[in-house]
Amino acid sequence: MEPLRPQITYGPIETVDNEELTEADMLSFISAAVNSTGLIGYNIKSFDDLMDNGIPQIVKQMFNVDITYKDQRDHTEIDKLRESVQIQFNFTDVNIERPQHRNYSQGNKINLLPNKARLSGLSYSGPVKLAAEVILTAHYSNGRQEVKRASIPPFQVSTFPIMRGSNRCHTHDLSKTAKKEIGEDPNEPGGYFIARGGEWVVDLLENIRFNTLHIHYHTMQQGNNEIIRGEFISQPGGAFENSSQIIIRYMTTGAITIEINSTKFSKLRIPWYLIFRMFGMTGDDSIIEQVVFDLESNSPVNTFMIEILEKSIHVSDPIFQPVQHELNREKIIQFLSEKVSKFVSNPSAYKSDENAVQYLNERQLTILDKILLPHMGQTADTRVRKLRFLGLLIHKILLVIMNVFPPTDRDSYRTKRVHGSGVSLAKAFKAIFNTSVIAPIINGFKELLKQTAFEELTQRNIIEAFSAALSKNTASDLNRSMEQSIISGNKTIMVRQRPIVNRVSTQSLERKNLLNTISALRTVNTHSTTNASKQTERADMMRRVHASYPGYICVAQSADTGEKVGMSKQLAITANVCTAGEVLSLKQRLLSDPAIQQLADVSNKDIVRKGLARVFINGEWIGCCTNAFELAQRYRMLRREGKIVHPHTTIYWDSMVDEVEFWLDVGRLTRPLLIVDNNIEKYNEACYKAAEARKKGNKDWEKHKISFVQNTRFTSQMAKAILAGTLTLEDLVAQGICEFITPEEAENCLVAFSITELRKHKHDVTRRFTHVDVPQSILGLAALVSPYANCTQPARVTYETNQGRQTGGWYCFSWPYRVDMNRFFQFYNEMPLVKTIAHNYVIPNGLNTIVAYMIYGGYNQEDSVIVSQSFIDRGGFAGTFYREEKVELESDIESFGKPDPLITKNLKPGANYEKLVDGFVPVGTVVKKGDIIIGKVAKIRGEKDELNKYIDRSVMYGFDEPAVVDAVMRPHGPNDEIFGLMRLRYERNLNIGDKMSSRSGNKGIAALALPTSDMPFTEDGLQPDLIVNPHSHPSRMTNGQMIETTVGLANALQGVVTDGTAFLPINVQLLSERLAQEGLRFNGCQKMFNGQTGEYFDAAIFIGPTYHQRLQKFVLDDRYAVASYGPTDALTGQPLDGKRSHGGLRLGEMEHWVLTAQGAMQTIIEKSHDDSDGCISYICRNCGEPAIYNASHPIYKCMNCDVQADISMVDSRRSSIVFQHEMRAANVNITSVLSPRVFQPA
């Protein structure tokens, strides 16, 4: 039987004509990739997979309950005969519907739309409905059994958070017009959750690759004699199944132990050979053969391995000393059962019962079958395969010990996976569902069987008990816990008073602009480990850009300061995250391939002697082959056909260990690459003919030779078709022009960095490229915003990725229907004159400003910028700032309305109630400090006084800056409580102290608003909007901004928009000619006049349009904090911090340094002591205890010393006094020792 081979043939590569293909045309390939998957399509696909496959699989397969407990009921004679009761139930149907909420006015449930959830503070959750089958079996002492069965019809258990834009969302597949009608942004992709009215993003989370051995050297610590360890997490399937971890350790004593991380094994370190003996392999030679493969080989590596293994077998272990030399598998299993079976309370009695011994032994083997390497099988007939695989793991660890192979690279994405929201929420759901649903059902049945005789049970009793266990409280537990897992992030949450570690990494979605929203949805977080926060070499390596990042992780975008540097990353522009594929069909196809010998048909000796390569699928060892390279290449060609092998299948040949790996698990990063074909077969054949002709003495032997040609089949016509929308990425994949490559398979590829590099080596047979890349694909969306980023210092590009997310703009098109807290809406946004490919996917967030690079007075130092007053007056960077006020009616005695001063007490003094209409200030009204914006009163219960029926609980506007009421709403909460929701609008023109930034990361602060009459101007009368100091560029090396200004000047004069995407070629000669055509110098500099004196400047000034963005850091928001007074804490008296509490600005460490450098130490003392919580305390010198002082009646008194008291006045702090009170409350006394009195001579 011939192996399956690809059927599609491609035309000769020599005939492909793509000489017209340019670097700019290659950008269309990025557009095709983004249009195919969407920038956040993987996140929605991950959640859809959870809804369609994950939750049903988890509930149906992992929660098949089967428990037996001793019957406690003894009311009747039948009860006394009943020994035990077996409870069995499994869920037969799981369905998660679209979000709904109860309409209390109509008494029914209606569809819950996303904007309704935002405004009403609801959670966008869909009902979870379950159906189950229950079997209750009573076991009697006389051997009789009685069975009761019941079918639980589908009913709602709880609700589950629904992702906006998923297939369970009401906006799924809606047209743009339909989305507008329900108050949604028609261009918004979704991908986030709405929990309690707020928007949250579940981050992509890095994780190690399952079913892979990770070998690491272990740091020698006190009390730890471990040299090296191998960690292996085994997971069958590849997505939502439970996993099991084993740790193989090599100790300084020579022992090799295996630890099975399971609650059933109590983390015992079992000698490795005992695992083999328990599974029936008792001979030492046969056990060692599973590791070394060939005992008869005399190679140095083989000999050294045998020495290590023989020594490890004879190393004494204090725990397993009784069975160290035991060959009887039953005794070994029995010994292990005694160690791990917690219910064996009386071992001596248990050993005398043969049935009990046999039961425990079988039970132990069954547990081992399920938790030891479950990806290799979970039944008894797979034990031999597991032992062979376990021997292979130990073999690889020994190779690392002998320095044959290096340990696992922890930072390489070859051995990593990125888990989306679906996998993260599945982990949280498993733990929460078990605690909040399964446990109450079991307890409910136990209570039913305790109260009701088993023979009297009916199907109705069972259904009612099942439903009662999942009451409203249980439903709220599941719903509340899932919401908490999203809101709290990676922390411990409490479910039914049980702590559960939450593995979901989330962040609040701050809608500053569309770029910020998309970047939040493309964030990849690394697990926060203890090593990450330490100043160690490991912490430094974790943060570096790894060689496996390009094309998958943006090499420029990360946090610029703090612990998140290098730990919080972004996906590259074309990177995508795969869901789990269909493993079974590919496995069957591989096992039926004649080129692959199944594992059971291959002996260990044959692997070594015949040089066979091992074949794996999702980490499962299924067989061997003779030619690994040919097998990998053949299946890659089949993948290009797309009929037998899925296009997203990873096919990797590890030449170091000669293994072929097929991966279809969840979380693989992938990206499309253009395939490079060549004529190597024809070239080799021609060279062979030429060599034969030369050998025969043929003088025309060179005529047989042909040129080696390698090229891509991607052409400029295809690039134009992509831009026209007539060609997609799926079409390119189907035609075999591109394919998806993961970080593993990238190690088998030689990728040309660009089409230019490919053409440079088109006829170079020593550089046979497999693929050609698009240079821009190594960057993420935020980094691609920066024009000519490859000409700018990389650190500045990193700064821009963070500044670009903070810029003002249109954060969404549905802003009129939303009420958001602290959102800035910029009025005027322009498309840059020098755009990049990123602007095809995000709306612009800045303005084309005329910038003059010059020194003009003392107000534009490096970070300072002089702004033209006319630019501000024309609306430059002007916008609206929104705040919200939200008030809830806490009970039925409260109501909205204008308080009547005749029957309401506790009216706020000095407050203005006159603007209220029906409890709210009307839309369009200007409110100032002291105005009541929401009127609310509460009726006093039991009050008989007609003049004091109500108490005022109104909300007063407390900011110094006037605001305009923009919107007023009265939504209903989840329990029909009424909210008062008000949106306030503020004008935010550019002010002195506000920040702005170019797209090259060059940030500046508005230092002076100069009148138009004083601004410099050119000979043509052109005045700059901004004056930037040229000294800010050499040290920052923002060459990209200089190029942008030059190109922008030519574009403005010629009325065109050009592409300044990073890595596009720059023709300096052509740019100079364009400037010369417009009558300018070749470098863009112009002669300018001083606006204050009218004189020429001695030097020509570089002036031109540069795209600037305003950062959302407003001086007006901080003005209230700059004062000598403000609110203080009621307990400590210290000033409050934060905008919400109207607190002050923190006097930080650098501020202390500035004051210290100026010699203003007294100012530091005043600010940190007198203006903080400084106070006077009175202490008795005799006993050191606090004394009593009454200022109104000059009384000094010590409770201990009475009239003998010697009381002194001491400078202190209120926080210190509070601390002393707390210590005394804990029965710890604190006394003060004062310096002795010093009397001055008269």
Swiss-Prot record:
Catalytic reaction annotation: RNA(n) + a ribonucleoside 5'-triphosphate = RNA(n+1) + diphosphate
Single GO MF annotation: DNA binding
Residue spans, zinc finger C4-type: 1180-1201
Database matches in Pfam families: RNA_pol_Rpb2_1, RNA_pol_Rpb2_2, RNA_pol_Rpb2_3, RNA_pol_Rpb2_4, RNA_pol_Rpb2_6, RNA_pol_Rpb2_7
InterPro entries recorded: DNA-dir_RNA_pol_su2 (IPR015712), DNA-dir_RNAP_su2_dom (IPR007120), DNA-dir_RNAP_su2_hyb_sf (IPR037033), RNA_pol_bsu_CS (IPR007121), RNA_pol_bsu_protrusion (IPR007644), RNA_pol_Rpb2_2 (IPR007642), RNA_pol_Rpb2_2_sf (IPR037034), RNA_pol_Rpb2_3 (IPR007645)
EC id: 2.7.7.6
Record keywords: DNA-directed RNA polymerase, Host cytoplasm, Metal-binding, Nucleotidyltransferase, Transcription, Transferase, Viral transcription, Virion, Zinc, Zinc-finger
Miscellaneous comment as given in the Swiss-Prot or TrEMBL entry: The binding of ribonucleoside triphosphate to the RNA polymerase transcribing complex probably involves a two-step mechanism. The initial binding seems to occur at the entry (E) site and involves a magnesium ion coordinated by three conserved aspartate residues of the two largest RNA Pol subunits.
Family statement: Belongs to the RNA polymerase beta chain family.
Name of this protein: DNA-directed RNA polymerase RPB2 homolog
